[in-house]
Regions:
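Internal "kinase-insert"/substrate-recognition segments embedded within catalytic cores
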Residues: 1-76, 124, 128, 159, ...
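Compositionally biased, intrinsically disordered low-complexity regions
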Residues: 3-5, 29, 113, 118, ...
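Active-site-proximal structural scaffolding
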Residues: 33-37, 59, 63-68, 83-86, ...
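Active-site acidic catalytic loop and adjacent metal/ATP-binding pocket
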Residues: 60-112, 210
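C-terminal catalytic region of ATP-dependent kinase domains
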Residues: 93-228
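Ser/Thr/Gly/Pro-rich low-complexity, disordered linker/stalk segments of secreted
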Residues: 230-237
Length: 237
């Protein structure tokens, strides 16, 4: 889905009228029918219902995969996506009436899109993982999971796994291996957008940002750092 002003792209349930979701259908990669569209609307209706239960959510969405998607989105603060003010850069996949999300376009992660300060990126709240200006009611699809205690705990567990990956040295090993492989290519690239010195400074800054992000998420999971925008606005420490 695309477009910051189109409410159907944010995967909210609007009504039963298929035309209300025209932005989604217009972005279809494969040929789809009204029958296919009806399955999507029915799924959104059940997912976004105030009565949605653990079982009903699992019936209409690939809960485990979407929770993993949410954990990564939150960790890397990718706001050029469903979590930002412009709900786009994703693929919606339906199979057997179950919805799934395929991620796309992460080049503006870690605050590259619509983020304020470095502190905002590092401490981006895990339990309201959307741009600060977004009402939680405008992200019903994700809030259905975050409002469910079972799925919230599972989401937190996936975040914890990402934190562990950073803090146990595995990320450093991969990061250093990749940068060593491209260092000379960057240095000798005649079409480079940045100087080699700028690249060197940036790669160290990115590494530090990821480390600080992991530290903040651990604090939010432990309860020592507020995990919502509201909580953080009341606690400037």
């Amino acid at each position: 889905g695309f477009g910051s002003s189109d409410s159907s792209a944010n995967l909210n349930y609007i009504d039963d009228d298929l035309d209300s979701y025209e932005t989604i259908w217009d972005g279809s990669v494969f040929k789809s029918s009204d029958s296919d569209h009806q399955k999507v609307v029915t799924a959104l209706k059940n997912i976004c219902s105030e009565d949605a239960s653990t079982d009903s959510l699992a019936e209409y969405m690939d809960v485990d995969n979407i929770l993993r998607y949410m954990a990564v989105q939150t960790f890397v603060v990718n706001l050029d996506s469903l979590t930002g003010n412009m709900p786009h850069n994703y693929y919606l996949y339906e199979k057997d009436s179950e919805l799934n999300i395929i991620p796309w376009d992460y080049n503006l992660s870690y605050g590259g899109f619509q983020s304020g300060s470095a502190d905002d990126v590092i401490n981006f709240p895990i339990d309201t993982p959307f741009s600060e200006s977004i009402s939680l009611e405008d992200r019903q699809f994700f809030m259905a999971l975050l409002n469910n205690e079972t799925y919230l705990a599972q989401y937190h567990e996936y975040l914890s796994q990402l934190v562990e990956y950073v803090q146990n040295g595995k990320l450093d090993a991969v990061y250093d291996r990749i940068t060593s492989q491209i260092d000379n290519l960057v240095k000798t690239d005649p079409t480079a957008f940045y100087t080699y010195d700028e690249y060197t400074a940036a790669k160290e800054m990115l590494k530090e940002t990821i480390s600080l992000r992991a530290e903040s998420i651990q604090g939010q999971l432990d309860g020592t750092i507020p995990s919502t925008w509201e909580g953080q606005s009341k606690d400037s420490s």
